[in-house]
Amino acid sequence: QRACPRILKKCRRDSDCPGECICKENGYCG
């Protein structure tokens, strides 16, 4: 389990996302 805050955040790359979230193919962190 990754430490990923459950917020809807648009992204283009993993580093755009907080915590251990990754940028998913739908364009949002998850």
From Swiss-Prot:
One of its GO terms (biological process) is negative regulation of serine-type endopeptidase activity. It comes from the Eukaryota. The keyword Secreted applies. Disulfide bonds join C4-C21, C11-C23, C17-C29. InterPro entries: Prot_inh_squash, Proteinase_amylase_inhib_sf. The record marks R6, I7 as: Reactive bond. One of its GO terms (cellular component) is extracellular region. The modification Pyrrolidone carboxylic acid is found at Q1. One of its GO terms (molecular function) is serine-type endopeptidase inhibitor activity. It is found in: Secreted. Pfam families: Squash (PF00299). Keywords: Disulfide bond, Knottin, Protease inhibitor, Pyrrolidone carboxylic acid, Secreted, Serine protease inhibitor. SMART domains: PTI. Belongs to the protease inhibitor I7 (squash-type serine protease inhibitor) family. Inhibits trypsin; probably participates in a plant defense mechanism. The presence of a 'disulfide through disulfide knot' structurally defines this protein as a knottin. This is Trypsin inhibitor 3. It comes from Momordica cochinchinensis. The lineage of its organism: Eukaryota, Viridiplantae, Streptophyta, Embryophyta, Tracheophyta.
